[in-house]
UniProtKB/Swiss-Prot annotation:
Marked site positions, Could be important to modulate the pK values of the two catalytic cysteine residues: 157, 207
Protein name per its UniProtKB record: Diaminopimelate epimerase
Residues annotated as the enzyme's active site: 73, 216
Origin: domain of life: Bacteria
Gene Ontology annotations of biological process type: lysine biosynthetic process via diaminopimelate
Catalysed reactions listed for this entry: (2S,6S)-2,6-diaminopimelate = meso-2,6-diaminopimelate
Functional pathway: Amino-acid biosynthesis; L-lysine biosynthesis via DAP pathway; DL-2,6-diaminopimelate from LL-2,6-diaminopimelate: step 1/1
Gene this protein is translated from: dapF
Length: 282
């Protein structure tokens, strides 16, 4: 009944990697609530590793702290790759997700790189409630936030570009309102971005199902695409987050490559039915 897990983070994005390859039961809502409410195990996302069903090495399920499922989590995917590499399962991986195959690797410098695939830029490929002709400029407003750019990288993101210091914007006030806007029947990730040069921007994110987060890898990818679409940056930029930097390359073939560090906090065993756990002794 006990399942191996590791508490990790990607630039402060709190991740639990759970090894369910041999588990009899999947994670229950009770277990998710118990882990999310415990200060030691509180997380933004659970990355559950399962045997694959397609041409992949492993299948990944992603759970938010509120019990909802996510379709993509860039930092969580990087943590999974680090976990797999640390368990001597290789350095290059193909991971099956609900939106397709994601490829990633641990580089020789120790950083983790993930190919997030191509973004969806057409409104017909996005869960929105009304017709949108130009997703590069969408009329949605909350306080000083207006003129959003919508980008989907498996999950939907609304990016608002701000000329002033984004630290002065109360995202905890506007994020929930925009996340639940009627335009987004499946809710939305909300980010504010400040361009600092042609090669960098600063980002803060209100994450769907998790709230204000220190880092969101898919938001970093979406913001880089949005900035390039508007002619604000080059294809290869640094995205500055509260806890560090993610390197984002929006290639000519439109694949998004995200590279950055991960951190292991502790490992242990947990019960996927109840969420009770025990740390490993070092």
């Amino acid at each position: 009944m006990k399942t191996p897990f590791s508490k990790m983070n990607g630039l402060g994005n709190k991740i639990i990697v759970a090894d369910l390859r041999k588990a009899i039961h999947n994670i229950t809502p009770q277990a998710i609530q118990a882990l999310a409410s415990n200060p030691q195990t509180h997380f933004d996302q659970i990355m559950a590793i399962h045997p694959p069903t397609q041409d992949a090495d492993f299948r990944i399920e992603i759970w938010n702290a509120d019990g909802s499922m996510a379709k993509a989590c860039g930092n969580g995917t990087r943590c999974v790759i680090e976990w797999l590499a640390n368990h001597n399962l290789g350095n290059n991986f193909r991971l099956e997700t609900s939106t397709g195959i994601v490829e990633g690797k641990r580089q020789t410098d120790g950083l983790i790189s993930v190919d997030m695939g191509r973004p969806y830029l057409n409104a017909k490929d996005m869960p929105v409630s009304r017709e949108i002709i130009d997703t590069n400029h969408v009329d949605i407003t909350a306080g000083p936030l207006q003129d959003a750019c919508l980008v989907s990288v498996g999950n939907l993101h609304a990016i608002f570009f701000i000329e002033s210091n984004i630290q002065n914007i109360p995202l905890e006030k506007y994020g929930p309102k925009l996340e639940h806007d009627p335009l987004f029947p499946e809710r939305c990730n909300i980010s504010i971005a400040q361009i600092t040069s042609k090669k960098s921007l600063t980002l803060r994110t209100w994450e769907r199902g998790a709230g204000l987060t220190q880092a969101c890898g898919s938001a970093a990818c979406a913001s880089a695409v949005a900035a390039y679409r508007r002619g604000l940056t080059e294809r290869h930029i640094d995205v500055n987050l509260p806890k560090g930097i993610l390197s984002i390359l929006y290639r000519d073939d439109e694949h998004i490559i995200m590279t950055g560090p991960t951190e292991h906090e502790f490992s242990g065993l947990f019960n996927p039915l109840t969420g009770t756990y025990k740390k490993d002794h070092l």
